[in-house]
Amino acid sequence: MDNDNEILFVYGTLTNPAERMRLLGRAIIASPAQLAGYARGQKRYYFVAKQSGAITKGAILEGLTTRDLKILDNYEEVPTLYTRDRIEVVAADGAHIECWIYLPTDWATA
């Protein structure tokens, strides 16, 4: 049985509702959130990299299933381009939330 309570922080293409609908076949609500200590950059794809004092604005996607994460892992080319790791973000209401994030492999800093 799938876990339907997975949370993912997104900061690039997956912030687009149409892209999420195309990939997952259903609407996923996104709530504003921030990731402290990371700056967003872009080469061929968006990425975040550790940077003291930086804040990356993005969104948290809640109610994702294990199946959804597998689809998104494939889309993000895990483990070639990204890894899916746990991280803490701050929601718009100030709550600290532990969630998944896609972090780049070496391509972003090379």
PLM region descriptions:
Residues M1-A110:
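Glycine-aromatic micro-motifs
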